[in-house]
Amino acid sequence: MSNTILQHLPIGQKVGIAFSGGLDTSAALLWMRQKGAVPYAYTANLGQPDEEDYNAIPRKAMEYGAEKARLIDCRNQLAHEGIAAIQCGAFHISTGGVTYFNTTPLGRAVTGTMLVSAMKEDDVNIWGDGSTFKGNDIERFYRYGLLTNPSLRIYKPWLDNQFIDELGGRQEMSEFLIANGFDYKMSAEKAYSTDSNMLGATHEAKDLEYLNSGIRIVKPIMGVAFWRDDVTVKAEEVTVGFEDGVPVTLNGQSFSSAVELFLEANRIGGRHGLGMSDQIENRIIEAKSRGIYEAPGMALLHIAYERLVTAIHNEDTIEQYRINGLRLGRLLYQGRWFDPQALMLRETAQRWVARAVTGEVTLELRRGNDYSILNTVSPNMTYHPERLSMEKVENAPFDPSDRIGQLTMRNLDITDTRDKLGIYTHTGLLTVGKDSMLPQLDKK
């Protein structure tokens, strides 16, 4: 068994813990200190929409026994990784055309690298977090952590039988904190769990594991419950501007940073519940899970970006962009966003697709994912309506005789195709006749 993963608490050694301030990490930090480890707490500011006071979290960590507690601002890096994912179309999970924008995998890529980098500055080479052995995050953090620090070892309280025996549930953890003088009140038990960052929110587990429970039990944290009749959602026009593949304006307004642009995109999309989806997906270990997702800003920017992509690039480029995006989305989901094969796909899309994407798209947003595109403007468009106008135009790029030649040359294989179908009929692979899909094939 690998000695990278520690199954028992390393007594007397520095242990970095990704500290959220919630019940699990609070109890784990105090427990590790009492058992003889030297815990260091690291909190990632990812712009979580449900977090009210980031600065209070390190103070809480110190109260629970942290040797040192640091707040790491990850928002700028997260915003740029989100833009990179949009530029590459790095999204492989969708249902009925509604996309999951890989917001949790993007958050883990940033958290895993930036927190471990901060730990290295403090000479902390053991890392713990709250991910369980059944999920994706345990593998994502493992990869990003070791990628950042090859000397890293990993200790997870939730893989330590002693911790599980003593503090195996929420009730036990709450009682442990109270017994040690902390007035910890458990929050009301929700029907599902939520994890979020600035790019999106994930709702899963508990009642949402049952497919007869759906979006109607979820209380959105980034927008409105658009499915409810008592929620008023007014139609709204919004114009998104891109320069060289980078979103730069919303309704003509520029922003001081990518973070500020994302926050405004979230506000606009959130007013409509844009970007919410219900997905059944394959986890890394090939077992299926179910999640309900929010990503209002990502959805808004993605729609506008893809509209410009289709207006600017040719069919083969768009096809390759989509194929590469599906593959890159899987790599991102698997915790391989910074692997060479992912960087190769990213560079291809960002250089040869995104660089040409300059322009503005105006949309009307309604309820949920209901929207219309009202206008598309770009100096780089290869869409020229006069080429295919149904009206008579002067200096037309081609005439009827040109099309006759194209039809002849482009379809020389019709005879070959008919002969092949005849072979399939002769061998019994196809049946001809009145009720078959090729009823006239046997007629010469």
Swiss-Prot record:
Enzyme Commission number, as recorded: 6.3.4.5
Record keyword Cytoplasm present: yes
Record's subcellular location: Cytoplasm
Pfam family, one: Arginosuc_synth
Recorded metabolic or biological pathway in which this protein acts: Amino-acid biosynthesis; L-arginine biosynthesis; L-arginine from L-ornithine and carbamoyl phosphate: step 2/3
Superkingdom per UniProt: Bacteria
Residues binding L-citrulline: Y100, N136, R140, S193, T202, E204, E281
Binding site for ATP: A18, F19, S20, G21, G22, L23, D24, T25, S26, A44, G130, T132, D137, D195
One GO cellular component term noted in the UniProt record for this chain: cytoplasm
GO terms (BP aspect): argininosuccinate metabolic process; L-arginine biosynthetic process; urea cycle
InterPro entries found in the cross-reference section: Arg_succ_synth_type2_subfam, Arginosuc_syn_C, Arginosuc_syn_N, Arginosuc_synth, Arginosuc_synth_CS, Arginosuc_synth_type_1_subfam, AS_cat/multimer_dom_body, AS_multimer_C_tail
Family: Belongs to the argininosuccinate synthase family. Type 2 subfamily.
Name of the protein: Argininosuccinate synthase
Organism: Histophilus somni (strain 2336)
